[in-house]
Amino acid sequence: MATRNPFDIDHKSKYLREAALEANLSHPETTPTMLTCPIDSGFLKDPVITPEGFVYNKSSILKWLETKKEDPQSRKPLTAKDLQPFPELLIIVNRFVETQTNYEKLKNRLVQNARVAARQKEYTEIPDIFLCPISKTLIKTPVITAQGKVYDQEALSNFLIATGNKDETGKKLSIDDVVVFDELYQQIKVYNFYRKREVQKNQIQPSVSNGFGFFSLNFLTSWLWGTEEKKEKTSSDMTY
């Protein structure tokens, strides 16, 4: 039977503190390294900890040890008996996964609303979903916070510099706390396309109407003139 490493508890406590800190600071679109297995790259589901404080999914490390009798990271000798269950870590993992799930739901709703706004019938006013809450203008490069708030990247960056990393409500926020919202960017491109086309349509329509009226009048005059010429020619060619 393997002797329990006296530092196991200390390793666990340290790992839990650092994992919780990383999870709290991580954007939901990222994956905290301390909550994932270094072997399979997936979230820790059945975590075990080694005497040196490295954490793995039990199934992955056991499979590794079938062919290699060493720790994947330290390269020091390691056996299955050296592994200690680490269920306490699952509280942090599950909490982050839940945060990720809620964030994705919120983000999907934003994208759905943006799709509708991008294809509206009238383009007289910019939809609120495409307006930056700071600059009050159309967003060029959208970025999103962990809470689902959207800004224009340049406007937010300048604002945070001026306020010492505080958002418009006074809460702490840095440019590192946001990620580019590409799905919204694509809908803004669609909106700009339709808005530009609508503007061009409104500008061209009067000219086309005037041009068509002029063309119709000329065509009618020419047709009538040609008809009269044909009548006269026919009359002159007739013999009595």
From Swiss-Prot:
It is found in: Secreted; Host cell. Keywords: Repeat, Secreted, Transferase, Ubl conjugation, Ubl conjugation pathway, Virulence. The keyword Cell inner membrane does not apply. PROSITE patterns: U_BOX. Gene3D superfamilies: Zinc/RING finger domain, C3HC4 (zinc finger). The keyword Secreted applies. Pfam families: U-box. GO terms for cellular component: cytoplasm; extracellular region; host cell. U-box 1 is critical to the ubiquitin ligase activity, and U-box 2 mediates interaction with host target. This is E3 ubiquitin-protein ligase LubX. It comes from Legionella pneumophila (strain Paris).
